[in-house]
Amino acid sequence: MESMLNKLKSTVTKVTADVTSAVMGNPVTREFDVGRHIASGGNGLAWKIFNGTKKSTKQEVAVFVFDKKLIDKYQKFEKDQIIDSLKRGVQQLTRLRHPRLLTVQHPLEESRDCLAFCTEPVFASLANVLGNWENLPSSISPDIKDYKLYDVETKYGLLQVSEGLSFLHSSVKMVHGNVTPENVILNKSGAWKIMGFDFCVSSSNPSEQEPKFPCKEWDPNLPSLCLPNPEYLAPEYILSVSCETASDMYSLGAVMYAVFNQGRPIFEVNKQDIYKSFSRQLDQLSRLGSSSLTSIPEEVREHVKLLLNVTPTVRPDADQMTKIPFFDDVGAVTLQYFDTLFQRDNLQKSQFFKGLPKVLPKLPKRVIVQRILPCLTSEFVNPDMVPFVLPNVLLIAEECTKEEYIKLILPELGPVFKQQEPIQILLIFLQKMDLLLTKTPPDEIKNSVLPMVYRALEAPSIQIQELCLNIIPTFANLIDYPSMKNALIPRIKNACLQTSSLAVRVNSLVCLGKILEYLDKWFVLDDILPFLQQIPSKEPAVLMGILGIYKCTFTHKKLGITKEQLAGKVLPHLIPLSIENNLNLNQFSSFIAVIKEMLSRLESEHRTKLEQLHVMQEQQRSLDIGNQMSTSEETKVAHSGSQQIDKVFNNIGADLLSGSESENREDGMQGKQKRGSLTLEEKQKLAKEQEQAQKLKSQQPLKPQVHTPIAPIKQTKDLTDTLMENMSSLTSLSVSTPKISASSTFTPVPSTGLGMMFSTPIDNTKRNLTNGLNANMGFQTSGFSMPVNPNQNFFSGTGTAGVTTMSLGAPPTMSNFSPLTIPPASVKQPQQRPTDMSALNNLFGPQKPKVSMNQLSQQKPNQWLNQFAPPQGSPVMGSAAMGTQGNVMGQAAFGMQGNPFFNPQNFAQPPPTTMTSSSSASNDLKDLFG
C-alpha cells in the first residue's frame, strides 16, 4: 500500500513538474490557469494539450504547449526551422475563422522554454482516438483509452473535414498540405476540426483567376517536424513536385481509410528512401481494387477508391464529397443542421425541433449529450423557441443519469422554471413533473419546481388549472409531506372554493381523493373533511366528489374515520346531501350505501366498546367485593384486640366468669338441675341475664377511641387500710344475702402487652398474687354495664372462716410463664389486719349486683368472649368449697397460664377439668339460700 502511494505521489509530482516546466514563464499563464495534460496533436503529435480555464471568466479552454526540449538534439538552425514551421501553422490557424477549423482563443506566445497558445476546449486528436498515444502522459486517461467512434460520429466527422477542406479550397484558395489524423482535433463536443497549417500553400494567382499553388520539393535532409507526413501525402507531391486541391482530397481518402482501418494508413512509407516507396505506392494505387478496401463501408468504398486515384483530376473535390449518399445519414444530417442552426429563422427551427424527438432515440447518448444538448440549451434565451426546445431537453434528461442531469441540464432549466410566458412552458413542465421530482435535488425542488406548480394552480387559465389538478396525483408520492401539507393542499382547496368553473371544482375534489393515501390520518380528519362542508355548490358531480372523499377516507386502511367523527360530523353532513333533488337514483343509492356502511361500523364499534366496558366493570366489581372482604377481615383482626380488652374489663364482674361456650353452660345447667332445682330468685336473675346477653349480642361492635390519660391527682390514700376493711367486710355477710360461687370456668382474655395487679384475700389474710400486669394502665369501662359485687372474690368462693385451702387444676404448661399456685393450708399465714378493697372498686369501675352461679351458667354466649372460652365439651372448674367444716372443691387456678393476655398469638386454652358435684356443697347451698 505504501509503495502504491509513493508511486502515485511520484506520478503526480512528475506531471506537476512537467506542466510547470512546460509553461513556466510563458505569457499565456498570466491569463490562463493550466490544468492536466489530456492529449497531443499537430504535426508529429508535437503539441501537448492541457485543459485550462481563463482566469477572468473561468471559461474552459485548451492550452497547446510545445516544449523546446523535444528538439534539443537538433542543430540550432534546425531548431529555428522547426520553431518557424510551428509558428507559421499557428499563426495561419489564428487568422482563419470557420466552424470546421479549430478556434484559437489566445494567439501563440513564446518563452525561452516553450511555445503556447489557447483554443476552444479539446478532447483529443483523431490520432489519439485511433490509438496513437505518442507524447501523452504515462497514465493515459480511460476516456481516451476506451474511446470508440460511433458510425454517426465517423460519418459526420469526415463530413466536417470535407466541409473544412471545401472552405479552404473554395473560399480561401488554399491547400492544407498535411491533412492527417494528427491535425484533426475532436473538441469537447465531439466535433472534428482541422489544425496544422504548417505546410499550407496559398494560391499565387489573384482571386479572380484559376488558383495556382506553388510546391516545394521534398527535402529528406530537413527535420521530420519540418516535413509533412508522407503516409498521407499525395504521390504527385513527391514524384512530380506538384500541388493542388486534389492533393488534399487524396489525403482525405487516406484519412478515411485509416479511420475505418483502426488508425493504420493504406501504405507504409520508408522515409529513408521516399522516392522508391512512392514509386511502389503508385503502382499499387493503379491496381487498387475493392478487395483492398474491405474494411471500408460498402456505401463509401467507391468514393474512397476515387479519392485514392493516382490521377488528381479523377478525385472528387471537397464540395462533391459533402454531397455523397454516405453522408445523408439521418444522424449526420441532424448534427449538420445543428451546426447551421444559427443561420435558421424561428419557423425553420420550430419545424426542426418538432421532428427531433423522432431522431433522438436513434443517436448515441454521447452524441446527444456532447453535440445536441448544448445546441438545444442555447435556444433557451429565445422565449418563442422554448416550447419547442423544452420537450427535447426533457427527453434527453430521461436518458441521463442523475449526476449528468444535475451537471448538464438542471443549471440550464433554472431560468426556464421562472418563465410564465408562453403558457405552454408550464404545461410541458407539468407533464414531465415526475421526471423533475425524481432527478432534481430536494433543495431545487423546493425552490424551483414546486413554486412552478403553485403558480399553475393560481393561474388565471382554467385549462392550466385543470391540467395541473389532473397531473398532481401522478407525482404526489414524490412531493415531501411538509410541502404537500402546508403549500399544495391549501392551494387546491382555495382553487375549489374560489373558482367559478364546475370542472375545476370537480377536478379539485378528484385530485384530493387521489392524494388522500399520501396524507396523515389526523390531517385528513381535521383539515380535509371539515373543508368538504364549506363547498357551496350542490351539483351532482360535486356531491359525488364529496361522497368519494368520504368513502375513500372511510374505507382506506391507513386512514379511517373515528366513530366520534362519524356520529358528530360526517353522517350529519352526508344525510342531508343524500336527499338533494339533483341526485338521480344511482347517485342516491351510492349515498345510502355509504351511509349504511358507516352506521353499521358505528354500531359495531360502539357495541364492542360497551361490551368491553361492561366486562371491565364486572371484573372491577368482583375485585372491589374481594377487597372489601379482605379489608373487613383485616379490620376485625386489627380491632379485635382493643374491643376484646374493653369487653373483658367492662364486663370483668360478670362476663369474665361466664365466658364458656353455650354447650358448656348447658352442661352446667344440667349439672345444677341434677343437683337440685333452682329457686325462683335464681330463675329470675338468670332470665335477666339472658335478656342482657341478647342485647349485648345485637349491639354494634365498639370502635376504639383515643383515650387521653388524665394526670393523676396527687392525693395521699391509704390503700392498705381500704383493702383490709373490704376484706373484713367479706367475713360478715348475712345469711340472707345470696352468695355466688366461683365460676365453673374462667374465660381467657387476650393479651395486649399491658399489665394489671390483682389482690385476693385467702384464709382471711392479705396476700398479693402478682401476674405481671401493670396496675397503672387504665381501661375504658363504658363498654358494658353489668353490675358487679364489689365484695366478690374473683378467684374463690365467698370468703368464710372455714376455708382452709384451694385445689388448683394444673393447666398445660405455657412457655415463659409458670402457673400461679396457692400455698397449702398447712402453711400458716401470718395474721394481718383486714384489707381495704375500695381501691379495687376504683380500679374495676362501676360494680354490678351479685348474681348466682346458676344464673351465670345460663347466660348466653358472647361472640367475643367465646374466643376465650375453652372448647366445647372440655372439663370445667369445680365449684368453690363452702361450709364451716372445710369442704373443699377443686377449681382451676387463675394463674399466668389461665390468663389469656399472656398468650396473644392464639386463644386456644387448655382443656378445663370437668366439674364434680359435692353433696356437702349442695347442702351448704341449701342452708345458704334457704
Swiss-Prot record:
GO terms for biological process: brain development; clathrin-dependent endocytosis; endosome to lysosome transport; negative regulation of canonical Wnt signaling pathway; pyramidal neuron development; receptor internalization. Could autophosphorylate in presence of poly-L-lysine. Gene3D superfamilies: Leucine-rich Repeat Variant, Phosphorylase Kinase, domain 1, Transferase(Phosphotransferase) domain 1. One of its GO terms (molecular function) is ATP binding. Residues 32-327 form the Protein kinase domain. Residues 680-694 have a biased composition (Basic and acidic residues). The modification Phosphoserine is found at residues 658, 677. Component of the AP2-containing clathrin coat that may regulate clathrin-dependent trafficking at plasma membrane, TGN and endosomal system. A possible serine/threonine-protein kinase toward the beta2-subunit of the plasma membrane adapter complex AP2 and other proteins in presence of poly-L-lysine has not been confirmed. By regulating the expression of excitatory receptors at synapses, plays an essential role in neuronal function and signaling and in brain development. This is SCY1-like protein 2.
